[in-house]
Design a protein with these regions (language model features):
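N-terminal glycine/serine-rich phosphate-binding loop of ATP-dependent small-molecule kinases
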Residues: 1-93, 119, 147, 219-220, ...
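Active-site core segments that coordinate phosphate-bearing ligands/cofactors
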Residues: 3-4, 109-129, 135-167, 177-188, ...
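Conserved small-residue
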Residues: 14-16, 21, 73, 100, ...
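Structural signal for short hydrophobic segments within the conserved structured cores
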Residues: 25-29, 202, 352, 453
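A generic structural motif
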Residues: 29-30, 98, 173, 295
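Short beta-strand-loop/turn "lid" adjacent to the catalytic site in phosphate-handling enzymes
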Residues: 61-98, 123-128, 159-180, 203-206, ...
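Alpha-helix termination/capping residues and helix-transition junctions
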Residues: 64-67, 76, 145, 198, ...
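A conserved helix-loop-beta module that forms one wall/lid of the active-site cleft
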Residues: 194-206
């Protein structure tokens, strides 16, 4: 048996699988977000641990026998979150999350004054990354910054609670911007730019390697053996790729979760920071990936639900009553700023071209189309950087919305395949990493999923949405020149 634990933004998910990768059971526990000011997004690290404990307790109710047979555990999690620990290894403050944009000024300083972030770190400095968050803390909370003993990422804080060891994997560590991506190790130069040293960083392992062993106390609580191995694990996007068998050059995925991700595997470090692409280590040895990210994918739908008081099913029903090829209002999905390709923390969400006859269904269609335009913008960046995938899988909750996938496939002019089993995700990828950490070979573990359906580009949709996308881009450029 193998356990995968994913520390998401909206909740923690734990999955239990057998040696044949059949899902035995899963459990989830929701998480809240603290938003005290515009642009702020925080969570207490203790919330993650409490949620993990709740998912394990839920699994214990009906599957204690299977839990007792777990050989290894894999971890995945939301990337970039800053968890600052004091001399007693207690959090100094709530974790500053990936979608927190307060450090836009600090990101600009690092990006303009330290070109090594783009060359060694492989990425333009954006507010979502960990490095500018630490610099913000140094400037605005110096009394806390000076007490930092260790900085961990969200899933690595959970590893610390499980094992007592401070360790990260290379895929997640890539998102700090303190990693020498090509050489797969911490960079003294990049850390020094933020007033930090390698002594304040966790040890590093490959995602598929063993990192530590479950502590005796936690093993006893969870009814497990004392020799359960903890895999290095992965950031959420790399873990999702592992779960989908996206492990070799030419493999790609589009993830429609809270954020939207376009992911393409490479066999070498291929930075393209100037064009807005991210270059990270993958969760497997000698493997890298390029990635484009938009900050509000399904989160845009969540916002519309909150704003209208309607459920996603109700909004979809109203949308289905509209003409699917009629030009919808245009929506900019920049509710938390934007990463790829704009790198603009000040970008804002907006509707354009709203007419008297438009209603909630039209707004829902506009949101789906606007997020699709954002995904296409990120995809185009990867293509221009040489990372065009030869086949694409869809993952995340939004992948179940065929209309949405149809829009994306038609706009990027590429087929998109949807896995048959929608429970595949970061937690399953974490469980696969656990299997490899216990000694199983990559080719045996990282198989491709069974495909339920492949959505091919629809020429009518392409014809209808191409001019709308161009208009959306023109609107952004015009507004950015005036307001951003």
């Amino acid at each position: 048996m193998y356990l995968g634990i994913d520390i998401g933004t909206s909740g923690v998910k734990s999955v239990l699988i057998d040696a044949g990768q059949s899902l035995i059971a899963s459990a989830t526990s929701p998480l809240d977000i603290i938003r005290t000011q515009s642009g702020y997004s925080e969570q207490h690290p203790e919330w993650w641990w409490d949620a993990v404990q709740k998912t394990i307790a839920a699994l214990q109710k009906n599957h204690q026998h299977e839990l007792s047979a777990v050989q290894a555990i894999g971890l995945s999690g939301q990337m970039h979150g800053l968890v600052a620990l004091d001399q007693d290894d207690a959090p100094l403050r709530p974790a500053i999350l990936w979608n927190d944009t307060r450090c836009a000024a600090e990101a600009q300083v690092l990006d303009t004054q330290y070109p090594a972030f783009r060359t060694i770190g492989g990425n333009a400095v954006m507010p979502g990354f960990t490095a500018p968050k630490a610099l913000w803390m140094r400037s605005h909370e110096p009394e806390l910054f000076n007490q930092i003993k260790t900085i961990l990422l969200p899933k690595d804080y959970i590893r610390f609670r499980m094992t007592g060891e401070k360790i990260s994997d290379l895929s997640d560590a890539s998102g700090t911007l303190w990693l020498d991506i090509e050489n797969r190790d911490w960079s003294d130069e990049l850390l020094a730019a933020c007033g930090l040293t390698t002594a304040q960083m966790p040890a590093l392992v490959e995602g598929s390697d063993a990192s530590a062993v479950l502590s005796k106390d936690i093993a006893q609580q969870w009814g497990m053996a004392n020799d359960v191995v903890i895999a290095g694990g992965a950031g959420d996007n790399a873990a999702s790729a592992i779960g989908l068998g996206v492990i070799a050059p030419g493999h790609g995925l589009i993830s429609l979760g809270t954020s939207g991700v376009v992911f393409s595997v490479t066999d070498q470090f291929a930075p393209a920071a100037d064009s807005g692409a991210h270059a990270f280590c993958h969760a497997l040895p000698a493997t890298w990936h390029q990635m484009g990210v938009i900050l509000s994918a399904s989160d845009s739908i969540s916002w519309l639900m909150e704003s209208t008081g309607l459920s996603v099913d109700e909004l979809t029903q109203k949308m289905d009553a509209t003409n699917s090829l009629e030009t919808s209002p245009i929506f900019h999905p920049y509710l938390s700023g934007e990463r790829t390709p704009h790198n603009n923390a000040d970008a804002c969400g907006a509707f354009f071209d709203i007419k008297r006859h438009h209603h909630q269904g039209d707004l829902m269609r506009a949101v789906l189309q606007g997020v699709s335009f954002g995904i296409a913008d990120a995809y185009d960046v990867l293509v221009a950087a040489g990372g065009k995938p030869s086949y694409i899988l869809a993952t995340g909750g939004g992948s179940q919305n065929i209309t949405w996938i149809n829009y994306i496939a038609s706009i990027i002019d590429a087929p998109i395949s949807i896995p048959k089993h929608q429970d595949i995700g970061a937690a399953m990828g974490a469980a696969r990493l656990a299997m490899m950490a216990s000694g199983l070979p990559i080719e045996q573990v990282c198989t491709a999923p069974e495909i339920a359906e492949t959505i091919t580009p629809d020429p009518d949709i392409t014809a209808a949405l191409t001019p709308a996308r161009q208009k959306s881009q023109n609107l952004y450029n015009a507004i950015a020149a005036l307001a951003y």
